[in-house]
């Protein structure tokens, strides 16, 4: 079995029964179930949702996205071995810990396979809920260029790279391109202030203005739970991105929940504590891969400048990355997942065949 066989690169061509187009994102694909199948599964599996709640199958891939591009490696390697299973395992672990600590629910109802979630359809809040405990990444780059105002927050002078901030900073951005909002540019992932959100809460899909404080509370609480757990395994939770949405429970009550993934190496920066104390940064997240790309290509501005997207897409399409870099990233994902969950990630020989088998035999979702 070759490495490329073990990688699930294409995840939007599964024969899952659906009557809607498959939504294919950078990493995950979503198959909306028919109304009949949704009702049947809710009844058969006893999911705690309304009887008519729309359900979906969410399938993660092993594709690697960075700087808004999908990258590939030598030997026709179209993804990172173990990445999808590692990300799902980490999210599953944190969502369970959130539940144990009395935080909000997630959109996940069932986990048929390490690559698969059965989820309840949610109305997404159109915000990338980002928070930062250290100054690094894009915030540091902006700071070195003289910027001191960040999402309406004024940063103090004389901060140093990778320094711990005095408090957890909430630095939200838009989820996608939002149009017709005063003071918010119509570009992807643009930073916004709390006042932007307050003045336009309905356009960000909040049901009421009070829910802004609720999302902030859930963001801070979720960050604290993960940071505490990571501290126990000598890891630092540097910064992260959460996403939120609304669902209805079995009684028809609307509630704000966590959705997408949480606390993963894709959505967060995680540093090794011992290395940080000795003045070094060891990345246990995708950030190490981003740094590799910036050093690998002679003109890193292509990866950072949003006005050069066509060049960037060509760079990703035309360049097979060294196998060593792909496998180093695989080890990062597998190692941090094992540390967080306490169990090793088992690589599948043929994930696509396994997914089809379980959805056909145990869920009757494949004809």
UniProtKB/Swiss-Prot annotation:
A Gene Ontology term for the protein's cellular component: cytoplasm
GO MF term list: ATP binding; phosphoribosylaminoimidazolesuccinocarboxamide synthase activity
Broad enzyme group: ligase
Keyword Transferase set for record: no
Keyword Ligase: yes
Catalyses which reaction(s): 5-amino-1-(5-phospho-D-ribosyl)imidazole-4-carboxylate + L-aspartate + ATP = (2S)-2-[5-amino-1-(5-phospho-beta-D-ribosyl)imidazole-4-carboxamido]succinate + ADP + phosphate + 2 H(+)
Family membership noted in the UniProt record: Belongs to the SAICAR synthetase family.
Protein name, entry field: Phosphoribosylaminoimidazole-succinocarboxamide synthase
Organism: Aliivibrio fischeri (strain ATCC 700601 / ES114)
């Amino acid at each position: 079995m070759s490495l490329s066989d073990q990688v699930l690169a294409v995840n939007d061509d599964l024969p899952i029964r659906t009557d809607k187009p498959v939504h294919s994102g950078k990493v995950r694909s979503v198959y909306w179930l028919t109304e009949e199948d949704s009702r049947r599964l809710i009844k058969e599996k006893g999911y705690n949702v309304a009887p008519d709640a729309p359900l979906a199958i969410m399938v993660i891939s092993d594709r690697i996205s960075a700087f808004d591009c999908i990258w590939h490696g030598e030997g026709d390697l179209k993804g990172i071995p173990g990445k999808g299973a590692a990300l799902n395992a980490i999210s599953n672990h944190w969502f369970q810990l959130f539940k144990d600590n009395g935080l909000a629910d997630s959109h996940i109802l069932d986990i048929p396979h390490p690559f698969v979630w059965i989820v309840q359809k949610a109305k997404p809040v159109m915000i990338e809920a980002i928070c930062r405990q250290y100054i690094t990444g894009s915030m540091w780059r902006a700071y070195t260029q003289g910027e001191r105002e960040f999402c309406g927050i004024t940063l103090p002078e004389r901060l140093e790279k990778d320094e711990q901030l005095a408090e957890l900073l909430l630095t939200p951005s838009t989820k996608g391109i939002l149009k017709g909002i005063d003071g918010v540019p119509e570009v992807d992932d643009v930073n916004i202030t709390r006042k932007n959100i307050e003045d336009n809460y309905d356009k960000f899909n909040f049901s009421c203005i009070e829910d802004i404080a609720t999302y902030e509370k859930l963001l801070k609480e979720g960050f604290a739970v993960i940071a505490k757990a990571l501290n126990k395994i000598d890891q630092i939770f540097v910064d992260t991105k959460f996403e939120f949405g609304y669902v209805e429970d079995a009684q028809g009550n609307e509630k704000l929940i966590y959705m997408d993934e949480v606390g993963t190496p894709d959505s967060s920066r995680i540093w090794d504590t011992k290395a940080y104390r000795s003045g070094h940064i060891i990345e246990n997240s995708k950030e190490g891969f981003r740094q590799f790309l910036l050093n690998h290509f002679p003109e890193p501005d292509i990866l950072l400048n949003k006005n050069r997207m066509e060049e960037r897409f060509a760079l990703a399409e035309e360049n097979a990355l060294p196998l060593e870099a792909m496998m180093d990233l695989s080890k990062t994902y597998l190692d941090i997942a094992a540390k967080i969950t306490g169990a090793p990630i088992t690589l599948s020989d043929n994930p696509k065949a396994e997914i089809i088998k379980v959805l056909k035999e145990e869920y009757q979702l494949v004809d």
